[in-house]
Each structure stands twice: as structure tokens, then as C-alpha cells.
């Protein structure tokens, strides 16, 4: 709907009826931006109409809007008028600020607070002396002398007069007695020195200031006089007049005696206290020394006790046996010349093709007469050598139990064969074809000062294969000669063995083979030809009739196997048939 024309708007606001038959009423236009809030109600036209008589009646919507604006304006006017009235009343009712009232917390008052002295002046101008003292204390920060407060020293007459008033106030119960109240004697007044000093009226110094306290002599004298007057039923004046100066002297003497007695008592108490503290201190020091000694002694005992117990209880450690590898051996250690049987040796071997047959053949080869030494050369490559301290003969009790799965039913010699404790050698090479011939070879001596036990015969299955060759070569059908003297100690030893004294040799089988050839001179060990061994030279009477058995140096022979790098340097026994 379009905006009404100005003429129509004027007719609506003025209340003139519209010529249109419908008489449509439009809302008033919105107020302008700079419309005054305190606007007045629009005046009606000067033309007298019938509607002017009913202006106050809300016959039209425009009257309701104007009334709302008018109510708002009236509320604002009332608020402004009320504020003005309250401000005027506050100014009228605000009294003059008293000196002792607190100042308002304004910036100016806070700035001048250091120089503000209204409270100080109020205290200073009061009538009470304590208030004035507090005022000066606040003003100057310290207690001033009475002269600063305006007080003057009193004369003697004023002091006496005040003293009488003070005595009246001090002894109100003695008013019924007849006579003056302890008048001073003229002699005492003339002298002026013996009259008891009484506290004067008026403050000489402010309370709390240093100085002599009030003399209690007069009080004590007055109490004594009153007590005497009550006891004798006379007035205190008569008592004082009768005693005269004797009372003062008695009081002085009594006071001196009391002072001396008190001083002596205090001195004795102090000395006893000091002695007691000194004694306690000495006792404490002694106790502390004892405690310190007691505390130190257990530490020394604790420090020395482990060593003493160790030296007393722990014997010298025995020489430990050589450390064994995981595989265990069940027999004592044998000398180097003895055959080396390892713990993993199976039970009796099968027929000759089995590699273990050579081992038993070596056992038979090393079955010479007792107490004879064999010299074995070192192999080309020495196996692992286990260095150990000197061995100790250990009983079989120390042998650990056999592991599970290992059989120990292998027939062993009558005299238990020593078994080495070194690391097992490398695997055996394939066997070589045997040949018939002699296998004697002179070898350099590498002896070990140990006796070789004589063992019983090996199983029959092995003896059958080597009897014809070994017994005929060794000539065991003759009685063996006595053993030669022991050779010098060896320079190197690859194994550490323990020895067991050999039992007497068992009877040996008889062999009709011819005696062995004479011994050969000592020569160095070396590989021999694979196919032929030269015969031995004729016997030499000047040569030591001892030969050396060296199976490891021979590569072939009847019933022998060549074993290289299998055993460490062994010691073999030599013997002679002559």
C-alpha cells in the first residue's frame, strides 16, 4: 500500500473526516531521526468541529500513541526533579566534619595523609595525661619528658601536702582514730635527711620510662607502725613518737640484713646451680664418651670379624682338578704312553672293519712289561692342549655319575686304565691296508716321569687278530728285564694325568715266535715309506738294549693303523730281551 498524501495525513491527524466513504484510518508516520523526545502533542486545527469536544477520549489510535510518549516524558521529568531534590537535601543535612572523624578516601586525602595531624592534635589537647602522652608519642615517635608536656617540679611543701592527702586516701579505715596522721617530727624536718621519702603527687616521668621505682620503705614503716598500734591498743602517732629514730635504724638494719641474707642466699643458690650444671655436663660428657666408645667398638669388631672368621674357618683352597668338558670320563687319568680310551667308546667292537678295532690294537700294542717307558713322537699337528695345575690323585668317588644313555659295560683291564681328560681329538682317518713286517722304529724320547700300569688282556675278539704279530714282535715268552732308570723330566706336557700303582702282571700266553731283532739307534721320528720297512741293523753291544715302540709313526703293518693328529705326544715303554 502506498504512502498517503500530505493532505490526507493532515486530515487524519487533525480529525477531519475523510471524504472517502470507507473512512480508512492509517497509522502515523515513523518519527524523524532528530525527533525530539520531549515533543508536544500536536494541536488540533482552529476550526471548531464536533470532534474537538472529545479530544481526551481515546477514540482513535493516534491518541493512544501520543499518550504513551507523554507518559515516557513525564517519567523522565519526575526522575530529574527527584534527583535534584535529593542532592539539595544531602547538602542541607551534611554536617560539618568533626576533627576525630575519618577522612574520606580521596586522592587528595591519601596524598596528604602523611601530613595529616588532626588525630594527634585531638589527643594532645585532651585533659588526660595519658591521652596527651599518646598524642606526643604519635607526633614525635617517642615518649617525651614531663617538661615537654608543661609540668613543673613541685616544692617540698606541696609534696608534703599531697602526701597527707595520699595517706588519707591510702588508709581510709584509720579515720576514727583521734590525733593527727603521723605528723613529721621537728628534728627530722630540721635534719631533712632522715625523713622517709614518700611518693610525690603528680607524674615526674611518664609511665614506662626508666627510673627508680617507688620507694617501699615508707609503706613498710607505716605498716609496721599500724601493726604495733593495733597490738598495743594505742594510736600510731604514739608508737611513732615513742620509737623515734630507733624505728628507722631498725628498719635500715633489718633491710641491710635482709639484703645481705638475700644476697648470700642468691649466691649460694647460684653456686649450687652452677656446680650442679657442671656436674651434669661432666656426667653427660662421660656418658657421651662411653657411648662413642661403645659405638666405635662394634664397628671395629664388625670390620675385623669377617677377616678373622675367614682366616680361621676357610682352609687354603686345594688344587682343583682340571676342568672337564661336557663329556665325562669314568676312569682315572692314564699317563701319556697309555692307550687313550675316551668316554664315548662303545661297548665291545664289531669285526675288524670297525674303526674302533685299531683302538684296541693300540691297547694291545701298549701292553708291554710293567715299569718300562715308551717314547712316542709328537704328531704333525698337536691337538688342543689343556693346561692345568699339577694333578691330584682323586678317588673314584669324585667321578660324576654317567649321563643317561651311555653304557659303561665295556670290559676294562684288571688294573684300571687311566683315561685322559683333554678335549676329544679329531675324527679318525680311514684305515689303511695292513702289511706283514716289522714295525719297530727308534723314536726320540719324550718321557713323562710316570709309571704305566699293566692291564689285563683285552677281549678275545681283538686278541685273535693281533696275537701272532704282536707277541712274536715283542717276545713276551721271555722274562722281561728290570726297568731302566727313569728318563729326565719332559720339557712340555700336553696332558695332566693321575697315576695308580699297577698290580702284578697276569700270566701272559706263550709264543714260539723267534725273538725280536736287536734294537735300533735313536733317530728322529718321521713318516715311513708306505710299502717297505728296512730290516734292523745288527746288534751293538755298546748301545743301551732298549727299544721304543712307536705305533703312531708307522703307516702300515700287521694289525696296526696309522693315526695322525689323534693323540698328544705319548710316552712308551722300552724293554730288552737280553
Curated annotation (Swiss-Prot):
Gene transcribed to yield this protein: sydn-1
User: What is the organism field in this record?
Assistant: Caenorhabditis elegans
Q: In which tissues is it expressed?
A: Expressed in germline, oocytes, epidermis, pharyngeal bulb and neurons.
Q: Which GO terms describe its cellular component?
A: nuclear speck
Q: What does this protein do?
A: Acts as a negative regulator of nuclear pre-mRNA 3'-end processing (mRNA polyadenylation). Plays a role in tissue-specific expression of protein isoforms by regulating differential processing of pre-mRNA 3'-end (alternative polyadenylation). In neurons, regulates alternative polyadenylation of specific mRNAs including unc-44 and dlk-1 by interacting with phosphatase ssup-72 and thus preventing ssup-72 dephosphorylation of RNA polymerase II subunit ama-1.
Q: Kindly list the cysteine pairs connected by disulfide bridges.
A: none
> Where does it primarily localize?
nucleus
Q: Could you identify this protein by its name?
A: Synaptic defective enhancer 1
Complexes and interactors:
May interact (via C-terminus) with ssup-72; the interaction may prevent ssup-72 binding to RNA polymerase II subunit ama-1.
Q: According to the UniProt record, where is the region Disordered?
A: 1-62, 173-216, 426-457, 474-578
GO biological process terms on file: mRNA processing
- Asked whether the keyword Cytoplasm is assigned, the reply is no
Q: Is the Nucleus keyword given for this protein? A: yes
* Keywords linked to the UniProt accession: mRNA processing, Nucleus
Question: Where is the sequence biased in composition, kind Pro residues?
Answer: 481-491, 500-542
The UniProt regions of compositional bias labelled Low complexity, in chain numbering, are: 444-455, 565-578
- List localization entries: Nucleus; Nucleus speckle
